[in-house]
């Protein structure tokens, strides 16, 4: 059995897999670590949700709480912690050092720590998760699966920024991209689903959730992606601006008297759908506001879909054509309107959506293009945890 952990700055999500059947036998998450009112929310085997409140000052206490819950006589899923063969971690930023999943040891963790500058919120939290497991279960192998790894196949002309080269040499400033585990999972899964060989396929994967990114994939390898050095580049997101003129950033800093922390906060947490609409960062709430005729919400929605559409066109050019356009992520999987609006007007590229099929699809694997459509448009729900568990298993076998 494999335990998958995703440690954020104030949260830990977990899933326990039985790898013989690939089934999730326990799952849940801890929220508000280090804050008042921290709790663990778990899904019982019968699908019932349960909330356990507990003071969780830091990640080690959280991991311990999760492990104790897994063997709890009432809500547990296993009899003893010995049943866990390994732990797989979602690691956010692996820099240029990691292009595939690895067994975590001292040397690997030192190299990962060296990437902290690149993801100051996420990487230290990921490390806390690893250290917490080491403290409680010192003999269990742990595997790191990096969000940036899949994108390491991008060519240099796609990942370099047009800035003085020494900034790349000194600080590693370049495009890295994120959601890599999701893009890798869905691009592989869509080929299985359609019964095609990944070699020879040109695929554009759209991971649209609260954060959003698109990847251009050729022969199963990533050639380009919308997020950059940080997850702030590319699409318009729930609270992130996505692409913005760097000159506008310095202009705003000057006018508003903002320092780097202030401007980072503005662009990461107060912009995007929330900033434009003034309503919410949640697309469901935005939808409701649009239906109520709120002009700012309508503008935000138009901008949101337009950006996605524009990148699909750009990546079709970068790939020299496209065979499959894929939607995943919370919004991509569940909101048919988003898929419809993004694909509207792309008939010239051979993209034709079957509206009656599209309207019915919420979180299921499905082809939503018409039989006549030259490009297959497909919805594939992402399963990053399953891929992390599979990678962990593969590394264990080695």
Predicted features along the sequence, with ranges:
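Catalytic phosphate/nucleotide-handling subdomain of diverse soluble enzymes
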Residues: 218, 224-256, 265, 329-360
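Glycine-rich beta-strand-to-loop/alpha-helix junction loops that act as flexible
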Residues: 8, 89-92, 208, 322, ...
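Phosphate/pyrophosphate-binding loops at sites that engage ATP/ADP/AMP, CoA/4′-phosphopantetheine
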Residues: 69-84, 190-197, 312-323
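Internal helix-turn-beta structural module
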Residues: 298, 302-322, 332-398
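Short beta-strand-loop/turn "lid" adjacent to the catalytic site in phosphate-handling enzymes
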Residues: 70, 74-122, 143, 149-158
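Short glycine-rich, Thr/Ser-proximal phosphate-binding strand/loop in the N-terminal lobe
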Residues: 2, 11-57, 228
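Adenine-nucleotide phosphate-binding core of ATP-dependent small-molecule kinases
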Residues: 265, 272-276, 283-318
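Glycine-rich phosphate-binding loop of actin/hexokinase-like ATP-binding domains
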Residues: 150-255
């Amino acid at each position: 059995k494999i335990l998958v952990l995703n440690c954020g700055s104030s949260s830990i999500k977990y899933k326990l897999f039985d790898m013989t059947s690939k089934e999730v036998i326990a799952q849940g998450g801890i929220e508000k670590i280090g804050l008042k009112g921290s709790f663990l929310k778990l899904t019982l085997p019968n699908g019932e949700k349960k909330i356990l409140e507990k003071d969780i000052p830091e990640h080690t206490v959280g991991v311990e709480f999760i492990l104790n819950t897994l063997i709890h006589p009432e809500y547990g899923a296993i009899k003893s912690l010995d049943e866990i063969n390994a732990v797989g971690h979602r690691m956010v930023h692996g820099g240029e050092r990691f292009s595939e999943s690895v067994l975590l040891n001292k040397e690997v963790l030192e190299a990962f720590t060296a990437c902290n500058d690149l993801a100051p919120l996420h990487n230290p939290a990921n490390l806390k998760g690893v250290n917490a497991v080491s403290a409680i279960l010192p003999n269990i192998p742990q595997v790191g699966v990096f969000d940036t790894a899949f994108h390491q196949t991008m060519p240099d002309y796609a990942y370099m920024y047009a800035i003085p080269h020494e900034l790349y040499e000194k600080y590693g400033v370049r495009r890295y991209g994120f959601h890599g585990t999701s893009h890798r999972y869905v691009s592989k899964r869509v080929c299985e689903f359609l019964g095609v060989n990944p070699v020879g396929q040109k695929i554009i994967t759209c991971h649209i959730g609260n954060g959003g990114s698109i990847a251009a994939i050729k022969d199963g390898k990533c050639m380009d992606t919308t997020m950059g050095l940080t997850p702030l580049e590319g699409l318009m997101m729930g609270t992130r601006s996505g692409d913005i003129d760097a000159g506008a950033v310095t202009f705003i800093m000057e006018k508003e008297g903002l320092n780097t922390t202030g401007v980072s906060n503005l662009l990461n947490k107060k912009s995007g759908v929330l900033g434009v609409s003034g309503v919410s960062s949640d697309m469901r709430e935005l939808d409701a506001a649009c239906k109520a005729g709120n002009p700012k919400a309508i503008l935000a929605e138009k901008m949101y879909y337009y950006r996605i559409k524009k990148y699909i066109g750009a990546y079709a050019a970068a790939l020299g054509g496209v065979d499959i356009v894929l939607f995943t992520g919370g919004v991509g999987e569940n909101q048919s309107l988003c898929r419809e609006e993004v694909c509207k007007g792309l008939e010239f590229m051979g993209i034709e959506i079957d509206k009656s099929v599209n309207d019915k699809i919420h979180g299921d694997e499905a082809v939503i293009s018409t039989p006549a459509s030259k490009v297959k448009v497909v919805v594939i729900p992402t399963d990053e945890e399953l891929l992390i568990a599979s990678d962990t298993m593969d590394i264990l076998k080695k």
